[in-house]
Amino acid sequence: MKIITWNINRFDGVWDWYEKKKDKDTKYREKMAKAIIGYLVKLISNEDDVAVLQEFPYYEYNGSIQWGCDEYSNWTSLFEKNNLTVIEPYKKGLNVTVAVVPKQKSVWKKTDGDDCKTSFKDGYLNKYIELLKEFRILGIHLPSSSVLLPLLHRMGEADRPDLILGDFNSGDYVIKNRWDEERECERQQYRKLINVYGYTDISGGGVTNHITGSSIDHFLIKNTVLFRLNIKNVFIDDNKTLSTLSDHYPIIVELEKKF
């Protein structure tokens, strides 16, 4: 079983889509999308393989959010043509966190009546995807630890996700502006997932955002024998080719047995 987490930066490569307006370059974005899909096709082949992608574009961005312009279906159709299915969250936003699974044969499903659907504040819900097999995955894109931690508290030990993975925006930043201050806050909240809720980060602390040189993407597991004994391999794929497809590297976890 392979589980991947990767922030794909709206198929804008290494460009800062918010500042550079690279979203306008359709041909460039299609090239990036096809390269990312080609990479995922090689990894997601078994029924229990899954990739959680952050910053998957839902609405167009042209200096401001174009709420009436849904570009999501254009991108998901590219995945479908390559025998991959995109599972979307309940609530939409400019960018969403999605899961990608093998078309027609996946054992993963979006949870019914999930906690994300009912508990997260507007504006944050679109950054989560919750999946269920024999265990639960929560794919996230923070900042919104102030929402995530109370949710975990309300769930109780038995109902908390077995895996929490994604872009935590929790790197060790040098504080230069208010954005860095917010991310330092995220770092503090991230530590509570480890120290208070007992999760173990197996991502190894390597650089995942190669622009800032920070470790901001993480892969957390419940500290149980079930997972610790079945982890076969964990690595950040920092292949030079991938450094042109996004400002983030993917984290790949391989589990020894099927659940």
Model-predicted segments: where are they?
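Metal-dependent phosphoester-hydrolase catalytic domains
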Residues: 159-163, 169-259
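Active-site environment of divalent metal-dependent phosphoester hydrolases
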Residues: 10-13, 58-62, 94, 145-147, ...
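Active-site metal-binding loops of divalent metal-dependent hydrolases
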Residues: 6-8, 56, 142, 167-168, ...
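N-terminal, active-site-proximal structural segment of metallo-dependent hydrolase catalytic domains
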Residues: 1-77, 258-259
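His/acidic metal-ligating clusters that form di-metal
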Residues: 133-136, 148-170
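Soluble or luminal CAZymes and related metallo-dependent hydrolases
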Residues: 24-39, 67-71, 119-123, 143-153, ...
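Surface-exposed cleft-lining segments at the edges of enzyme active sites
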Residues: 18-27, 114-118, 135-148, 172-178
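Structured beta-strand-rich core segments of catalytic domains in phosphoester-bond hydrolases
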Residues: 50, 54-135, 142
